[in-house]
Amino acid sequence: MRPSRTLTTAAAAALVLVLAACGSGGGSGDDSGGNSGDSGGDSGPTAGKVGVILPDTASSTRWETADRPLLERAFEEADVDHDVQNAGGDAQRMATIAEQMIADGVTVLAIVSLDSASGALIERRAAQQGVQTVDYDRLTLGGSAEYYVSFDNVRVGTLQGEGLARCLDDRVGNDESVNIAFLDGSPDDHNATLFSSGAHAVLDEMEGYTSVAEQAVPAWDPRQAAAIFEQMYTRADGDIQGVLAANDGLADSVISILGRDGQAGEVPVTGQDATVDGLQHILAGDQCMTVYKPIDQEVDALAELAVALIDGDEPETTDTVRDPEGDRRVPSVLLDPIPIYRDDVKRVIDDGFQSAADVCIRDLEDICAELGIE
């Protein structure tokens, strides 16, 4: 085998009712994804079932284009019965999917929480039913997951901070202060907090940088990001020389606003996720860098951990991560992110994470050829 949004009080109360009402099981009827593998009978050599609930399609394209197919392939190769679904950005829908998975007999449930309040309720319900839980990619604050699988998210922010400093290097000095803006991820995504802390740990300690604006983007929504950055840019009278954008989706929004003022490519912008758009912006010179997280490694780590739990073994971990709300340390598998600049785009293509056919289009064909991307 392969290696092998914080809820309002009313919404949280409604979610409790959903979790309680769905406890008796029943037909799924959910259209967010289907079962992979048999739901009954012989499930193969590995006796157990894994459920994975992805969060949405808006915060990143990765969930459906990368995580879902890779997860399904990993569990198929491990000969493990599995069910991978997507909550579509709806916390109550995620709760309903979780209850159905529990009723269908999952022994391990991995979730990417939309927010910690709803995620913690799901994990509590799963524990009551004897289902082991894993936080995948995002730590559920105040939750009860036994394990956490993700990339080192503070390191992601560190790479972004170092990247922005590198791209602004020739502008710092001569007693001039460079104005930078921070466009952070969703305020109810703990990863966004970690990204920001890593970036600030770099830039706040360096001379020559002044933070003139910082704001989180609810639900990582690119449309809101564009509106937020436009306000930042206007209030600063366009006097912003660099932007720490938490991912490629937010970076795309920033670049669109800068483009209206003829500043796309003049103001370095960071990103994350090595998306097609992000790589294209880097090749075109409009984006400084992105952070590449080989999702196949994260998927394989989750598959290995889930199989170990099903087999009754203690999974191998690399670290522990502190849950500040639960006042506990969660055994974790943390993977290393990779900075990607213009000369590194080829690596992402060679890894098969993105394809040259998708990235190297129109005016970028010659640039790709120059960089040996094919």
What are these regions (language model features)?
Residues R2-S4, C22-E374:
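A residue-level marker of the well-folded mature domains of exported/periplasmic proteins
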Residues M1-A20:
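Sec-dependent bacterial lipoprotein signal peptides
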